[in-house]
Amino acid sequence: AIGPFAIDTYLPAFPEMAQQLGASALQIQQTLTFYLIPFGLMMLWHGTLSDALGRRRIILAGLLLFVLASLLCAFATCIEMLWLGRALQGMSSGVGMVVGRAMVRDVLHGAQAQRLMAKVAMLFAIAPAASPIVGGYLLRFYDWRGIFIFLALFASILLVACLVWLPETLAVEKRQ
């Protein structure tokens, strides 16, 4: 659920971000566009890349890129750096949604796969509603940069968990 979470968590920080970066409200709103366009485009490629290179490798690369992109956002000194960080977040944040579904198809079938995908869909439905609340809560204690540090830490935990526990589900001979 990192993709939907990354879209909405920072929304409560828009005014503070505009002030600190010396950016207009429109420029801050454009950070959503810089995120969503690569997010949508890469949804077409994550599956293809995982079919060719393996599921685990693509998930790990996507999470690593998301961590680095989140840190770039957190330490942005101008709106252009924030735009770049958001674009890189968008490129990488959909990897779990696409490749995760492929991994489920690799190992589960029928009712088992449907049950797991229903649980995943529930997480994707909850994330957009919960993430602005989380962002607002973080703003009580940190400035807007803390939200991106939080996203980097969250993705780092997922990255370590995947490194330790996530197996490759697509055998080399089945790769295309």
Specify the residue positions occupied by each region the protein language model found.
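Small-residue-rich segments within alpha-helical transmembrane domains of MFS-like 12-TM solute carriers
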Residues: P4, D8, A74, G90-V98
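Residue-level signature of mid-helix packing/kink "hotspots" within the transmembrane helices
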Residues: D8, L36-L44, P128-A129
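Extracellular/periplasmic helix-loop-helix junction of adjacent transmembrane segments
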Residues: A13-L41
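Conserved MFS/SLC helix-loop-helix module at the cytosolic interface between two early adjacent transmembrane helices
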Residues: L41-I79
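Residue-level signature of the transmembrane alpha-helical cores
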Residues: A61-L65, A69, G85, S92, ...
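Helix-loop-helix hairpin linking two adjacent transmembrane segments in secondary transporters
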Residues: T77, M81, A118-V164
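Cytoplasmic helix-loop-helix junction between adjacent transmembrane helices
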Residues: G85-F124
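Flexible cytoplasmic inter-helical loops of multi-pass small-molecule transporters
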Residues: L163-Q176
